[in-house]
Amino acid sequence: ACATGAAVTITGTIGSILLFGCEPKQKENAEHSILGQTVFSPLTGELKSLKDVNDPTFSEEILGKGIAILPKEGIVYAPFDGVVSALFDTKHAIGLTDDQGMELLIHVGLETVNLGGTHFEVHISQGDLVKKGDPLITFDLQEIQKTHDVITPVLITNADDFSEIVVQKEFGPVKAGDAILTVKK
């Protein structure tokens, strides 16, 4: 009886997908739950406080609230589903906006604007829709760190639109895709 019930459930789910083109809705979207919106790490490396960034524009939260990551790999991934709202010609920074209006800036390294795009490659364009985990930018970590600090601020630039921004992971090792921030309206 259990096997038959499971088969009916599976068949019913597949049938609804095939007939109606949609999957049954979950009670809550994990990335936009009642607890807040989740930002996942765009990089693998070491999670740090913004206070550890040797640039007052970031450490004093002038551009927004968030965290910093000292990258161990040269790949920036989408930290949530959203749209590429800003892409700098110098390829060192990207702005993303999610469907709830949260605006996020990922700024690879300090003073890397001066590289003029050298050692960076973008895989998306401004206006593109991206999914969590999509590769956005690759960069030559070894070459850039020869001349620049590669610590990467990850900022909610419209932080004033939210009641709370909570760091979800202890400072230390972080993998791309780990939950790092929760942002609450």
Report each predicted region and the residues it spans.
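Transmembrane alpha-helical segments and their short flanking loops
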Residues: 1-36
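Short, conserved beta-turn/loop elements at beta-strand boundaries and strand-helix junctions
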Residues: 50-55, 87-92, 141
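Short, well-structured beta-strand-loop connectors
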Residues: 41, 45-47, 77-84, 124-138, ...
